[in-house]
Regions:
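Active-site catalytic pocket residues across diverse enzymes, especially alpha/beta-hydrolases
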Residues: 59, 63, 147-150
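Walker A/P-loop-proximal flanking segment of P-loop NTPase domains
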Residues: 1-41
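Residue-level preference for the first positions of well-ordered beta-strands
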Residues: 37-39, 69, 124-126
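Mid-core helix/loop region of P-loop NTP-binding domains shared across ATPases and GTPases
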Residues: 5-9, 19-26, 78-142, 150-162
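Conserved catalytic segments around the Walker B and adjacent sensor/switch elements
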Residues: 62-76
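Short, glycine/charged-enriched secondary-structure capping and boundary segments
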Residues: 54-55, 141-144
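Walker A/P-loop nucleotide-binding motif
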Residues: 33-57
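Short histidine/acidic/glycine/proline-rich micro-motifs that form metal-
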Residues: 46, 73-77, 133
Length: 163
C-alpha cells in the first residue's frame, strides 16, 4: 500500500498513546473491582470517542476473561424520554425498534445484556455511553433502571458515561 493510499483513508490511522493506555487501565480497574462505572470527562475533540471504541474489545475481568462491552452515543433530540434512551440502547445492541413500550425495550435490553454476561465467570457486562452530557437527569435515571434490573438477575453491569 502506498503512502498516498494510507493518507487517503486516515480513519484507520491510530497511534496508541499513554493517555489511551491509562484510560483502558482505569476502565479495567473499575471492571475488575466490580465498580458500577464512572464518568469520563474531557474537552471536545480530544479523541475520547475514538479511544473508547478502540479499547472496547480489549476489556477483561479480574480473571483475564473478555467482557462484552457495548457502545452507544447520544445527540440532541426533540424527545427527551426514557423510552428514547431505551430505544437507542436497544438499536446499539442489535434490536429492531418499532413501537415497543419503554417496559418492553427495558426487558429486551436486560435479557440481551444478561445473555452477553454469561460469556465470563464473573457474569459481567459493560455499557459505554458517549456524549452523556446531552442526556437529561430523567434520561440518566434510565441507566439506573437497567442496572437495577440486571442486579436482580445477578448480573454485574458497569456503565461508563463519556462526556
Amino acid at each position: 500500500m502506498s503512502n498516498a493510499m494510507i493518507l487517503e483513508d486516515a480513519s484507520r490511522f491510530w497511534i496508541p498513546t499513554p493517555m489511551v493506555s491509562r484510560l483502558r487501565d482505569r476502565i479495567e480497574q473499575c471492571l475488575q473491582c466490580g465498580d458500577t462505572g464512572c464518568v469520563i470527562v474531557g474537552e471536545a475533540r480530544l479523541g475520547k470517542t475514538l479511544a473508547i471504541r478502540r479499547i472496547l474489545s480489549e476489556l477483561s475481568n479480574r480473571s483475564g476473561e473478555r467482557i462484552h462491552a457495548f457502545y452507544t452515543h447520544y445527540g440532541q433530540r426533540d424527545t427527551e424520554t426514557v423510552r428514547a434512551v431505551f430505544a437507542k440502547i436497544a438499536r446499539a445492541l442489535g434490536a429492531e425498534v418499532g413501537r415497543q413500550t419503554a417496559d418492553k425495550l427495558l426487558e429486551w435490553i436486560t435479557l440481551h445484556l444478561a445473555d452477553a454476561a454469561q460469556a465470563n465467570s464473573t457474569r459481567q457486562v459493560a455499557l459505554l455511553i458517549d456524549e452523556a452530557q446531552l442526556l437529561s437527569a430523567k434520561q440518566l435515571n434510565a441507566f439506573a433502571e437497567i442496572y437495577n434490573e440486571l442486579v436482580d438477575m445477578k448480573i454485574n453491569c458497569s456503565i461508563f458515561f463519556v462526556a
